[in-house]
C-alpha cells in the first residue's frame, strides 16, 4: 500500500546516528518523500553535487562522522540549490551561523515537527511544479 501515492519530493537525511537517521527516514517516507540517507557530510556533498537541484529538503545533524560538520554542509547545500529547505539539528547551542533560509532545531525535536515540515515542503514543492507548467 505504500506505493499507492506517487513520490513527490526527495529529502536528503544526514545523520551519523543510525537510529536517528532511520526514524527520520521512516517519518519522511510516510509523508511520501523519497529519501536519500548519508552518514557523513562528505557523502552528502557528493549527493548534492549530483542531485542537489532535484532535492526538496535536507535535514542534517551538526556533529557528523568525517571532517565536515552539518553547518558547513548546509552552506554547500544552499549554494547547490538556494531553494532547498535545510534543517540543521543539534543537542547543543549552535556555534556557527547558518546560511540564509536554513532552520535550526534543538534536540530533542518532536517527530510531529518532522511530519509538519515535510508537509509544508511538499506544498511548496507542488507550488513550484505548478508554476513551471
Give the ranges of each region predicted by the language model.
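A Lys-centered signature of the CheY-like receiver
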Residues: 107
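Short amphipathic alpha-helix used as the core "switch/output" element in two-component signaling
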Residues: 45, 71-83
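Acidic, metal-coordinating helix/loop segments flanking the phosphotransfer/catalytic sites
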Residues: 37-57
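Non-catalytic signal-transmission and effector/linker regions of two-component phosphorelay proteins
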Residues: 1-12, 18-19, 25, 54, ...
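Acidic catalytic/metal-coordinating carboxylates
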Residues: 40, 68-73
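Active-site residues of response regulator receiver
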Residues: 61-62
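Two-component/phosphorelay signaling modules centered on CheY-like receiver
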Residues: 18-37
Amino acid at each position: 500500500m505504500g506505493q499507492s501515492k506517487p513520490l513527490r519530493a526527495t529529502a536528503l537525511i544526514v545523520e551519523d546516528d543510525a537510529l536517528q537517521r532511520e526514524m527520520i527516514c521512516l517519518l519522511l517516507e510516510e509523508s511520501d518523500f523519497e529519501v536519500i540517507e548519508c552518514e557523513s557530510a562528505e557523502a552528502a556533498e557528493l549527493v548534492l553535487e549530483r542531485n542537489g537541484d532535484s532535492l526538496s529538503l535536507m535535514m542534517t545533524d551538526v556533529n557528523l562522522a568525517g571532517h565536515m560538520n552539518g553547518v558547513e554542509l548546509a552552506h554547500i547545500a544552499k549554494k547547490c540549490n538556494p531553494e532547498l529547505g535545510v534543517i540543521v539539528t543539534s543537542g547543543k547551542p549552535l556555534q556557527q551561523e547558518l546560511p540564509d533560509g536554513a532552520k535550526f532545531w534543538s534536540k530533542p525535536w518532536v517527530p510531529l515537527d518532522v511530519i509538519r515540515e515535510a508537509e509544508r515542503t511538499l506544498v511548496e514543492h507542488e507550488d513550484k511544479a505548478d508554476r513551471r507548467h
